Amino acid sequence: SDAIASLAGSWRGVDDARAHDLYREAFEVDPTDYYPLLNYVDGEIERTGSTGVLDILAPMASQAMARCRAHVDVGVNIPWSLSSLAKFHLLLGDPYAALEWYALAIRSANSPDAIPSLERTRAAATQIDGHGWCDRMLQMARIARFPEETATGEAGRTPTEGAPSIEGPVLIVAGSTDPRLAERIEGYRPLVAAAMAGFEGTVISGGTRQGVCGMVGEIAATGARARTIGYLPADLPANAEPDDRYDELRSTDGTGFSPLDPLQNWIDLIASGIDPSDVVVLGIGGGQIAATEYRIALALGARVGVVEGSGREASRLLADARWTDAPGLVPLPADPYTVRAFVANPPQSLGSVEREALARQLHEAYRGEIAATRSEDPAQRPWETLADDLKQSNLNQVDDIVGKLAEIGVDY
């Protein structure tokens, strides 16, 4: 089947009908070969504008998905095996799982061409649950991950109409809004307050009065320095109340709460020229939408701090072996001071020379305090030979000190 599928690929764009027939021939030879199977399904949907072919896909999908998953587990054909597994989940009616696998594919991509497109299935997009979510995410991710190699494509034309650009840095507060968990989530209010205390930039959340989103609105009303933006669907469920304490509420075109809300905030961020590395996410519990939000942020290169013990999707992410090695994922204790340090803005008015000079002084003071121990501890080395991560630790201490001074009005 590999040889036939390769031949089919050579006909793509030259004689698509010939390519389509060859893809069918290839998967008939080996029904477990996911590459020709998915290409045949894409071609049928593109040709007919309907999803009738999925009746054929469903019975044979399990073996092809098992082979695809086996490739993922041993790191074969990455990111294509990841995106193929995502496509199976999408076509078989599990869009939330599809989003998670697509996020892994986005994270693994080393070029814009390695991020898949759903162009061939758009003819039947309204017949495939969650197709719009996945399509929008992939278009946005291609630009966000590879801004210098991609033109401002369709994702660049879909920011919130008439909305001003978002100013960085950006803090996204995500997590539980389930009223049944209100009492438990209330215990995390000090963490949200600590995250927003002194934060200067833009804070984004869900824009309702429920759960962590409502905490953002309430804290904003007390005079927070940051500008707050809430994203919520135009067709808001009856049990959800918009929070007018936000500085701005932006509507998405979703029906009820969906991944379109966090996707739209990322589309707006990218359209505003915000680098994902300048975005910090604070995650507290949450359901399926939060699970998507955490993984999209990690895939794009944001820092995601997830509060340990907050349950549900936050806990599942921290236990997910596919994500635990993500550079941006940081497990956070339920401690306000740690959360504040995690989201803190680096002091902008302190020059790099002054910042390093203060860090050197802190390090020398530390060396002086422990000089009598004559330890071989690498942390006792002179600044010039100190490991980079230990230098960064001293620089972070400087940032924290300067930030605390700024909070009490001390001009540095």
Could you tell me what each predicted segment is?
Residues 6, 39, 84, 88-91, ...:
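"A position-specific structural signal for the A-helix of alpha-solenoid helical repeats
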